[in-house]
């Protein structure tokens, strides 16, 4: 495992992103993991007759991609999720390529609190998720 790097400072406007294509296996595995087997996610025939016209990914699967950026990139090591406001703007379909971008909107070094705007877009540049995250950035153990 690589050495973990704890950052000491961040700046407003700093960004990080991740790109992920949502596969059928991702949706099926997520459904089993959390126990949400809604036919909108699991049944082709049911989903085809729905307002979406085909199977959709779980909203929180997309939300989980935000967590991946926060935990691995910005703020990275030591980031402890305190809150996440999230709004689902459009469905994510199996096969969609999602770009997740987080941007620092506030950094309080005295409190070690970082606030980030969290946005997700599909391959057509349609915004599918927007929100705001607040994290405590812990220091490494001495």
Question: What are these model-derived regions, one by one?
Answer:
Residues 17-21, 87, 103, 134-136:
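Generic structural detector for well-ordered beta-strands
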Residues 72-100:
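Mid-chain, well-packed structural core segment of small domains
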